């Protein structure tokens, strides 16, 4: 796919190879270390949540916030070509296959799942680093999926990306001032004689010494490099930020600092986040609403309390069972581990029907024949499972313990079940296959 180099320049940083990453040693000058030693946090015997909550509370959901970004039936198929002189398309990698979600204005949506499920591809589709195979991405009346590169250029300033690896996402041959100031020059946001002052202002916003604008990336630690990446993403005052696992490459103490910084930025600039991560503890702290992906599909989406206390999809339950929970331990309980059998199927040839059925202990014949719809079973809760009509009461004893229902204060919620909420959000199927009656039923 051919893209306008000027359009891409402000969104995608220069990618450098492994050698460049090795040259960016994790060293910090004595001056910078002394100036910002107050940012360092001891993490002995602490987890992410306890560190993050020292100065920041978990983000809250605003149910009345309008959507700034609406994604509908988004698809991304990468062609697989044969070898030889005549290269033919012999298949497609279905990286993203028909997902739908909304990102609220000034809010955040978490996107979680195993490696290879399509999370990062989704983020690159939102920023139009990839052009979608199908579907729509509505942003302020514009369908980003249908725009040409030329039409996208003025909108790129509104949708920016924070990349995962702070060591390879910064060009080691450019100074911090050049890296952060590049988007300003591409879009001519400010006169050239004001670029430096704007760069220094942004460095101060992200907690770096503004006088270090003339230093190179290898003179900063990993956490500070990620702050540089955040400053670059903020340069154009975006309305949507796609954070692609922004803290996965950092130490846990630095993770908490960076996530708290992102919260401060969200509160100060009213920017919306699509927060991509595989660390469920971080997502729980930052995102009041979470979507769970598996093999290119969204299998469950809901608010924080519902997803973490009363997950309905077997895959979500398995993910959460693998997360150490200090709140469970605080009330004397434990969460039994759900171990998934087998490997994740190939996205080139995914299973028929439900894509999770090959690893699901509750799979039935209907799961192989019919793909489950994303069913709305609560006001802000949707599940893609044929047995969602039983509201979590699967046809076998639940693998997770009763203490899985724990509120945000760590108190157990006995017999936690979804609330009997009226279906208020249109656009989702309201029927499912009931295992007990062996027929399709409705809400």
Go through each PLM region and give its residues.
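P-loop NTP-binding/switch modules centered on Walker-like glycine-rich loops
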Residues: 239-242, 246-332
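Conserved ABC transporter NBD signature motif
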Residues: 135-143, 155
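Conserved ABC ATPase "signature" region
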Residues: 142-143, 194-211, 320-321
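Helix-to-loop junction immediately C-terminal to a conserved catalytic motif
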Residues: 127
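Conserved ABC ATPase signature
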Residues: 216-220, 224
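Short catalytic/signature loops enriched in Gly
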Residues: 36, 44-67, 79-87, 92, ...
């Amino acid at each position: 796919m051919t893209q306008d180099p000027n359009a891409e320049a402000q969104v995608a940083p220069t990618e450098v190879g492994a050698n460049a990453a090795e040259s960016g040693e994790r060293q910090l000058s004595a001056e910078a270390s002394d100036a910002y030693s107050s940012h360092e946090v001891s993490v002995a015997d602490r987890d992410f949540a306890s560190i993050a909550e020292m100065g920041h509370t978990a983000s809250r959901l605003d149910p009345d916030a309008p959507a700034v970004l609406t994604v509908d039936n988004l698809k991304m198929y990468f062609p697989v070509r044969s070898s030889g002189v005549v290269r033919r398309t012999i298949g497609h990698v279905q990286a993203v296959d028909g997902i739908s979600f909304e990102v609220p204005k000034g809010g955040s949506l978490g996107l979680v799942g195993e490696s290879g499920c399509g999370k990062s591809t989704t983020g690159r589709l939102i920023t139009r680093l990839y052009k979608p195979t199908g579907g729509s991405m509505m942003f302020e009346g514009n369908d980003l999926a249908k725009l040409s590169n030329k039409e996208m250029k003025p909108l790129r300033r509104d949708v920016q990306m924070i990349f995962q690896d702070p060591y390879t996402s910064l060009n080691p041959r450019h100074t911090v001032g050049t890296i952060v100031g590049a988007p300003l020059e591409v879009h001519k946001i400010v006169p050239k004689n004001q670029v430096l002052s704007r760069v220094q202002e942004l460095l101060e916003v992200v907690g770096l010494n503004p006088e270090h604008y003339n230093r190179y990336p290898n003179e900063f630690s990993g956490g500070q490099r990620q702050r540089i990446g955040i400053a670059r993403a903020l340069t154009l005052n975006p309305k949507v930020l796609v954070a692609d696992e922004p803290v996965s490459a950092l130490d846990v103490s630095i993770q908490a600092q960076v996530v708290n910084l992102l919260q401060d930025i969200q509160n100060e600039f009213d920017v919306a986040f699509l927060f991509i991560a595989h660390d469920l503890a971080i997502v729980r702290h930052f995102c009041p609403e979470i979507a769970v992906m598996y093999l290119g599909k969204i299998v469950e989406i809901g608010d924080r309390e519902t997803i973490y206390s009363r997950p309905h999809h077997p895959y979500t339950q398995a993910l959460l069972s693998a997360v150490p929970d200090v709140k469970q331990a605080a009330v004397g309980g434990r969460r039994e581990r759900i171990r998934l059998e087998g490997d994740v199927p190939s996205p080139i040839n995914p299973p028929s029907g439900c894509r999770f059925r090959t690893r699901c202990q509750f799979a039935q014949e209907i799961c192989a024949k019919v793909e489950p719809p994303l069913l709305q079973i609560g006001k802000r809760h949707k599940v893609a499972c044929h047995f969602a009509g039983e509201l979590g009461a699967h046809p076998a004893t639940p693998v997770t313990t009763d203490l899985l229902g724990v509120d945000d204060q760590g108190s157990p919620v006995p017999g936690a079940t979804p609330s009997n909420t009226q279906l208020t959000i249109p656009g989702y199927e309201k029927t499912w296959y009931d295992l007990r009656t062996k027929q399709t039923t409705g809400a």
